[in-house]
Amino acid sequence: MSVVVYAPASIGNVSVGFDVLGAAVSPIDGTLLGDRVLVELGSEAFTLATAGSFVDKLPENPKDNIVYDCWCVFSRELNKKNVALKNVHMILEKNMPIGSGLGSSACSIVAALDALNQFHDNPLNDVELLALMGEMEGQISGGIHYDNVAPCYLGGLQLMVEELGIISQEVPCFDEWYWVMAYPGIKVSTAEAREILPSQYRRQDVIAHGRNLAGFIHACYSKQPELAAKMIKDVVAEPYRERLLPNFAKAREYAASAGALTTGISGSGPTLFSICTDKDVADRVSRWLQENYVQNNEGFVHVCRLDKQGSQVTGSKL
């Protein structure tokens, strides 16, 4: 018996909701923009193999891989429930560039924990599993946060609430939106991107941030796509992180001139997203970004839609 789980890319923050909003996305051409993890019965307690486009970026020692840490915390939780742990052999297919702003670590974490849970007949519920995912994300970035793991696991646009035992809740979004995702092929570490942020903010920025986020959520629920797009502005991180992203300002300017509704930084970058309502506009923006924002052959551009499913079992073989 074996199981394979695919976990999609995600946009942390979605510009307007620093650390509290996240959206899962998938290319419209069917490309799997995300990681896959296979779990099968093993001869030892834990073994790990790696594969995929970005396998050379992973640590050589399996015990330095986040998938091993996922297995450790999953084992811990099963032990608490007195559920027997099976010997597992796992394969991580690493298709997501590391430090890309596409929720790369979240993809590996979500795929690994979801696959382990599926393989053991789902002893952990969604909230328990999501809590572990946040714990693992915190191990990498230095603080527990859910804005990538929640949409990656649950799908859609997720708002982190973290009250009453609820970690996140889905916010209705707009099916007609195309999300053009452009990764230039360079790395920006989440830790570095956090270090350049100020420790205190001016009152007017706090007010603007509250207005933008409240306005965006209201527009999503009241089905006002133009207003929602107008509210996607970042006063918390983008003004400080722009300098880490070569050509970001030019890309945003071009996208606006081509008809995109808004452009922002995905997570801590360097990936950007542009939202368009017209497929021709999305294709035009995509072509420009491919020629002017992508810097090497590791970079890519995809026209995406919101991925409403999140992580999913794709079969029993990679």
Swiss-Prot record:
Output the GO biological process annotations, alphabetical, semicolon-separated.
threonine biosynthetic process
Q: Specify the domain of life of the species encoding this protein.
A: Bacteria
Query: Per the record's keyword annotation, is Ion transport included, yes or no?
Result: no
Give the chief site where it resides. Answer: cytoplasm
Against Pfam families, the record matches this protein to: GHMP_kinases_C, GHMP_kinases_N
Q: Which GO terms describe its molecular function?
A: ATP binding; homoserine kinase activity
Per UniProt, ATP binds at P97, I98, G99, S100, G101, L102, G103, S104, S105, A106, C107
Pathway listed for it is: Amino-acid biosynthesis; L-threonine biosynthesis; L-threonine from L-aspartate: step 4/5
**Where does it reside?**
Cytoplasm
Enzyme group, top EC level? transferase
Protein purpose:
Catalyzes the ATP-dependent phosphorylation of L-homoserine to L-homoserine phosphate.
Stated family: Belongs to the GHMP kinase family. Homoserine kinase subfamily.
Q: Please identify the protein, giving its name as recorded.
A: Homoserine kinase
